[in-house]
Design a protein with these regions (language model features):
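Residues forming the flavin
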Residues: 2-632
Length: 632
């Protein structure tokens, strides 16, 4: 932090004593915004006692200096002008607590995303805008009041939606911690995609066996109730006290149903919900990379073919000598899904090595020649990251040929002419007929055009989000542009959603391999159990409040609320002084403080704690004030 302490001219003689801290963010802000000029512009605002600059306000050293200011100068409010509140709101709230300041007397002002990163070509304009934003933050802080978290009791039960590997592991983890679990699976069997796998990398375990062992533990566990052929169709209540409606598609044995209203629709109580609905594999369109031609298979179809083979691979009774893999089908395509599916490069390489291994059966005599399998990998980029690069190196050592095609010139798959045979120089051997040809260009050989005869073409298909429209509406889940569920922050809060008590894990939040899916499932276990095991949860108090004297229930607030937080209370009674009056009451646990109900109220009966009408007006006044031009 800067050694200079700039004290406001008013010396903080008003009713508030506010500290202002302007961050340079290691040049991210200070290279485009004059942080010294920002301090100079706001130091004389009413209530400002101290105003400083800092290289990194989030650093431990600077936080300690702010704590010292709060304690030594008796500050009752602080403004931190730095980066996005999404990144450091909790950082500075916790810092405020350590200093003895109510955490809701702190205001974060975003001058990085909103100023320095936005106006890189206009230092004076960015500085002036930053000064106005900080002034607005000071105005808001001057009207803040100490708030306490909303405390709600929690039910020690969890609904896990999805019985794939992530959901199963999450359910077992929650039960082992001591929570009751309702595991809801849409299909008739548990296991998801992994239940159909044979050998898996890197542990070499059989996917079917892994799922079977996990299911046996789940079925035996007294705290887990399993509903297959079922889906969640309704939710009411709020974090810690949800009521979840489960529709069972067929009659269940009475022994498997607990806490039920009927055999068709069950209502269970739960403190939290874990969503692990998984993914679907990309389904190519007819004609896409030759899809629909005999011998063109998707990666899941090819894996089933390999897993079912006990020896050298054959297709429709014909030995397979040449396989061409086309990578990034359904991923990294501007006209389709632009994201990388992460797992498919490794999965394709692993399958190709299994093909090579099965070409030489374990019982073959030493030195016996194995049928030659030529395998061509046509790729944009190979992304077998981390330890999975071992597979890539092994594949190349065992003869796999990797050809990189241009982004704007994808391989062309066509049916081979009837009776077409490879020439004597073909890797598959003279006289061997091929079903298909693949034409591509290889950037690693100067863009040379290659025509590869093939017995099989494997389209290495990626992951796509599962169709979950009804579940999205039921749980109010946020969905990203890619169609997967959105977490709050991929690094800091990777399994939490904006809906309190609803967690996501596995491939429903984005492409993952099985190990990553299990890891995220266990992360959801940790987050859920850390709240439910203690019996209560603390929620943000920045929520809507209703003036019962002004309210005359019209229902507009309920229509505007995506979380159904406003509730109609009949005959207000003593709370409103009129037993015949109906008013709105906000469910404090359900409200997220979005403010959508405030402007629609015709009686102006709703206000938002932390962002009241008075605070918003004061912030607008601060934004409209002139600022001294930047010294550049």
């Amino acid at each position: 932090m800067s050694d200079e302490v700039v004290t406001g001219m008013n010396g903080g003689t008003g009713s508030r004593r506010i500290g202002v801290y302007v961050c340079g963010c290691g040049g991210n802000i200070s290279d485009y915004v004059s942080v010294d000029d920002v301090v100079a512009a706001v130091q004389d605002e009413p209530g400002v006692v101290v105003a400083r600059t800092a290289m990194f306000t989030c650093s431990d050293a600077t936080q300690q200096e702010i704590i010292n200011d709060i304690q030594e100068r008796n500050l009752d409010g602080i403004v931190v002008a730095s980066c996005s509140p999404k990144l450091h709101t909790f950082t500075f709230r916790e810092m405020s607590k350590r200093a003895g300041l109510n955490p809701y007397e702190y205001t974060q002002v975003n001058i990085r995303e909103q100023c320095s990163w936005t106006h890189t070509d206009d230092r004076a304009g960015a500085t002036g805008k930053a000064a106005r934003l900080v002034r607005a933050g000071i105005a808001r802080t001057g009207l803040t009041e100490p708030l306490e978290p909303v405390v709600v009791e929690t039910i020690p039960k969890v609904v896990v939606i999805g019985g794939g590997i992530a959901g199963m592991r999450a359910a077992l983890g929650l039960a082992e911690i001591g929570l009751a679990v309702f595991l809801v699976e849409k299909e008739t069997e548990l296991g998801g995609w992994v239940a159909g796998f044979a050998e898996m990398y890197p542990h070499g375990k059989d996917g079917r066996g892994l799922v079977t062992r996990l299911e046996e533990k789940i079925r035996r566990h007294p705290r887990i109730t399993v509903f297959t052929d079922a889906e969640v169709v309704g939710k009411s209540g709020s974090f810690g006290n949800y009521e979840v409606n489960i529709r069972v598609g067929r009659e269940r044995p009475e022994a498997t149903v607990r806490e039920t209203n009927s055999l068709e629709t069950l209502t269970v109580e739960a403190g939290s919900i874990v969503v692990a609905t998984g993914f679907d594999s990309y389904a190519p369109q007819a004609g896409e990379f030759g899809y629909g031609l005999d011998g063109v298979l998707t990666l899941p179809d090819f894996k089933r073919l390999v897993d079912s083979s006990d020896g050298p691979l054959s297709y429709h009774g014909t030995p397979v000598r040449t396989i061409v893999y086309v990578y990034c089908v359904g991923s990294r395509q501007p006209e389709g899904n632009e994201y990388c599916s992460r797992y498919c490069c490794t999965a394709a390489i692993h399958n190709s090595l299994q093909v090579t291994a099965k070409a030489a059966p374990a019982g073959a005599a030493p030195g016996a020649a194995a049928p030659r399998i030529s395998q061509y990998h046509l790729y944009r980029d190979i992304r077998s990251y981390g330890k999975y690069e071992i597979l890539y190196n092994e594949s190349r050592e065992k003869g796999g040929l990797y050809l990189r095609f241009p982004d704007d010139e994808a391989p062309v798959v066509a049916q081979a002419s009837v009776g077409a045979k490879a020439g004597g120089g073909s890797a598959s051997g003279a006289g061997h007929s091929h079903r298909l040809t693949v034409t591509t260009r290889d950037l690693l050989t100067g863009g040379a055009e290659l025509i590869i005869p093939a017995d099989l073409v494997v389209l290495v298909t990626g992951m796509v989000p599962r169709e979950n429209d009804d579940l999205v509406k039921t749980l109010k889940l946020p969905v990203g542009n890619d169609g997967f569920f959105n977490e709050i922050h991929p690094k800091l809060r990777p399994v939490e959603t904006v809906v309190d008590g609803v967690f996501i894990c596995g491939a429903c939040q984005g492409p993952k391999n099985s190990a990553e899916a299990v890891a995220s499932g266990l992360a959801a276990v940790t987050q859920s159990a850390s709240i439910l095991k203690r019996g209560y949860a603390e929620l943000d108090p920045l929520i809507a409040v209703v003036d019962p004297d002004a309210c005359e229930w019209c229902g507009l607030c309920l229509e505007a609320c995506p979380y159904e937080a406003p509730r109609r209370v009949e005959e207000g009674g003593e709370a409103v002084g009129d037993p015949r009056k109906a008013v709105a009451v906000i469910d404090r646990a359900a409200c997220k403080g979005c403010g959508g109900c405030v402007p629609v109220c015709p009686k102006n009966a709703i206000d938002l704690l932390g962002y009241s009408d008075a605070q918003i007006r004061a912030m607008i006044d601060g934004l409209l004030q002139e600022v001294t031009p930047c010294r550049m």
